[in-house]
Amino acid sequence: MNFTEGCEATGRRPGSAGSRRRRAPRPGPVALLPLLLPLLLPPAAAVPLPAAADSSGEVGLEEEAGARRALLDCEPLARVLRDRAVQLQDEMCKKFTVCENSMEMLVRNNLNLPKVTEEDGCLLAGFDEEKCLTKLSSGLFAFQTYLEFIQETFDSEKQNVESLCYSTKHLAATIRQMVINPDEVVIPDSAAQKSLLANLKSDKDWIEKITMHLILRDFTSFMEKTVRAVRYLKKTRSFSA
């Protein structure tokens, strides 16, 4: 007897001959499973709704809260990265006498380091949020290889530079989350990173030291502009209460 026949048998009137003489076999656990699932699962899991169908606006509020947290986290982290870069520059000046006013700085200044320019929309006059955030995130991702070079070269500060690398990557990813079209953020592929890292290395120790100083100097400048841009965003971006 199949499951349908069992349901029909239990539907006979009590007291009829069929109900006294023939009892429907109890359906096994497998047969009951389709009936029990709606009772076992919470409503949201049983009938998932797309985010767009949420008329309560909770999804939008969650996205806003995430954007607010990301924005609030960016400024202090950017300040820390800027200050660490300044400290590393000071250490290089003390240990290697490679300082800002060294004449050797003119020897190698063709590193093509990321810079924030007027066209990037990060200046207070003509501030363009989407354009600026895209530039900042792309620039921070680009700095990864340069910082990795310092990590491999500046032995006495290897741990500090490693922390700088990790935090820079974290900030780049955080800012990327705030971009409307994150695909516009440029992230160097592994082949480009390996090629750049090889080009940064030199068999002359003093050239590598100058290279490190120039990287830290431009990274400090980039982070200073990042701090200003994020601070301005915090003042101007409006969130729902």
UniProtKB/Swiss-Prot annotation:
GO terms for molecular function: cytokine activity; growth factor activity; interleukin-6 receptor binding. Keywords: Acute phase, Cytokine, Disulfide bond, Growth factor, Secreted, Signal. GO terms for cellular component: extracellular space; interleukin-6 receptor complex. The keyword Signal applies. Transmembrane segments: none annotated. It comes from the Eukaryota. SMART domains: IL6 (SM00126). Residues 1-25 are annotated as: Disordered. The keyword Disulfide bond applies. GO terms for biological process: acute-phase response; cell differentiation; cellular response to cold; glucose homeostasis; hepatocyte proliferation; immune response; interleukin-6-mediated signaling pathway; liver regeneration. Its main location: secreted. Residues 1-46 form the signal peptide. It is found in: Secreted. Disulfide bonds join 122-132. Belongs to the IL-6 superfamily. Component of a hexamer of two molecules each of IL6, IL6R and IL6ST; first binds to IL6R to associate with the signaling subunit IL6ST. Cytokine with a wide variety of biological functions in immunity, tissue regeneration, and metabolism. Binds to IL6R, then the complex associates to the signaling subunit IL6ST/gp130 to trigger the intracellular IL6-signaling pathway. The interaction with the membrane-bound IL6R and IL6ST stimulates 'classic signaling', whereas the binding of IL6 and soluble IL6R to IL6ST stimulates 'trans-signaling'. Alternatively, 'cluster signaling' occurs when membrane-bound IL6:IL6R complexes on transmitter cells activate IL6ST receptors on neighboring receiver cells. This is Interleukin-6. It comes from Gallus gallus. The lineage of its organism: Eukaryota, Metazoa, Chordata, Craniata, Vertebrata.
